[in-house]
Design a protein with these regions (language model features):
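FIC/Doc superfamily catalytic core
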Residues: 1-260
Length: 260
């Protein structure tokens, strides 16, 4: 898989010299990233909702609508998780190994992603501790993720490999793919995998990449081919194309101004 990935990817720009400028670029990508990442997972979000929860105008203890609105909780959780992912990127900018940063940080990303469900009384804090405690299945996929017991062995091994990996493209592609393949949580695995992918992007100076909703079919088909057909090529091609567009200065995928 490694050779198939490396020859497809653009050359890495190298470690960013200006960490502040890089992090500003990440922040500027937030709205597009939140809209497309959440929409890929089936949530119905809008520019207005994303901006509202980001501004802090979200309170399930006061507003019943926010407590009952699944989309609002997902959007708020995405914003909270995005903040700690940025902190992880800051640690990588400070010279820490991206694999180590991901291993330590991904649990906090996950807790923040579902913290609004805890605030609304839907989940208990204990529900967010550790990896999944049961089997998970992926809709419209022939891939069956490992058992809960296998996950406990697979995740440390995964992070060990990620920590030792030196090829920027391999870190990006396999970081996303293997996390999604293991599916360590009952929910949120796609969002987590894309966060992990972008942390690996930052480690080599690639810009933050947004997976467009319009390419959801190709994205899911490429993951399926890698998971079931053991062919990482289409997935590597898809990510390489997105990276290439960003390096060429193309704008991020658009966000509709009206609610969907």
């Amino acid at each position: 898989m490694r050779a198939a990935i490396s020859r497809r990817f653009p050359t890495a720009p190298g470690f960013p010299r200006d960490a502040g400028a890089y992090l500003k670029g990440v922040e500027d990508a937030y709205v597009a990233d939140a809209y497309h990442s959440l929409s890929i997972e089936g949530y119905r979000v809008s520019l207005e909702l994303i901006e509202r929860v980001r501004s802090g105008n979200w309170n399930p203890e006061v507003h019943e609508h926010d407590r009952e609105q699944t989309n609002a909780m997902a959007a708020r959780g995405y914003w909270q998780s995005f903040q700690v992912v940025k902190k992880s990127i800051g640690r990588v900018m400070g010279g820490e190994n991206p694999g180590t940063v991901a291993e330590v940080g991904h649990r906090e990303w996950y807790r923040e992603m579902f913290a609004p469900s805890v605030a609304a009384g839907i989940l208990k804090p204990a529900d967010l501790a550790g990896y999944r405690g049961g089997q998970v299945y992926i809709r419209q996929s022939m891939h069956v993720p490992p058992s809960r017991d296998a996950v406990r062995d697979a995740m440390p091994a995964f992070f060990d490999l990620l920590t030792q990996e030196t090829d920027p493209a391999v870190r990006v592609v396999l970081g996303h793919f293997v996390f999604a393949y293991i599916h360590p949580y009952m929910d949120g695995n796609g969002r987590m995998a894309r966060f992990l992918m972008n942390l690996m992007m930052a480690a080599s100076g690639y810009p933050w990449v947004v997976s467009p909703l319009a390419e959801r079919g190709a994205y899911m088909a490429a993951l399926e081919k890698a998971s079931v057909g053991e062919d990482i090529g289409p997935f590597a091609d898809l990510l390489a194309s997105l990276v290439g567009k960003r390096l060429a200065g193309e704008p991020l995928p658009a966000v509709p101004k009206k609610s969907i």
